[in-house]
């Protein structure tokens, strides 16, 4: 069974790496796991933190608990500097795969994998992932429509993993709903008509409090606070999963 302290295979860079370093411990202390930190400039600067329980589930109440725990810590450490929105969310259906246990849990489903180091001159792969090796160093991928003479299955070294995520399919939606790792869509068990239209439309549970503002900076000459830039209007990232956002997002 996956543990909260299982190390991730990937890591952030820059400000996102600093945020991850600050929040990972407190998140684990609540019994959750950090999945990913991403910083974007959509609708004002947004710090998106993905988290989950060790079993892969995450509800809006859990997102709120994580947000309330890490918010004062981020206020104190101030890793971003500028005004920003803090968004805590579940990984979603087409979730990132960041731990060996993620690959184990979702073996048999389609994923996109990108390596930091090329393998046989290639970095990007898409196919059905298998169960990782016993020592957790490689994961097999069955490749569709390969050219004659090329292997249909490869073993990808996880030490070279740059990024990986599940591909949104009707089968994945149904299985995610069955496992409880995705919220139901308007009382239905998956939307087969719209399910596989786009890989980045998978709904997520989100908690977006009021925008965070940086500590006031003092003018060196007058010793008076310098006026901070105001964030752009709008609450967090606007997604195409509008029904879910209206139902599950708290402000």
Curated annotation (Swiss-Prot):
One GO CC annotation: cytosol
Ranges of biased composition (kind: Basic and acidic residues): 216-226
Keywords on record: Cytoplasm, Ribosome biogenesis
Region (Disordered): 176-251
InterPro entries on file: Ribosome_maturation_RimP, RimP_C, RimP_C_sf, RimP_N, RimP_N_sf
Subcellular location(s) of the protein: Cytoplasm
Keyword Ligase: no
Biological processes per GO annotation: ribosomal small subunit assembly; translation
Domain of life: Bacteria
Acidic residues composition bias: residue spans: 186-196
Predominant cellular place of this UniProt entry's protein: cytoplasm
Pfam family, one: RimP_N
Alphabetized NCBIfam families for the sequence: PRK00092.2-5
Job description of the protein: Required for maturation of 30S ribosomal subunits.
Annotated family: Belongs to the RimP family.
Identification of the protein by name: Ribosome maturation factor RimP
Gene: rimP
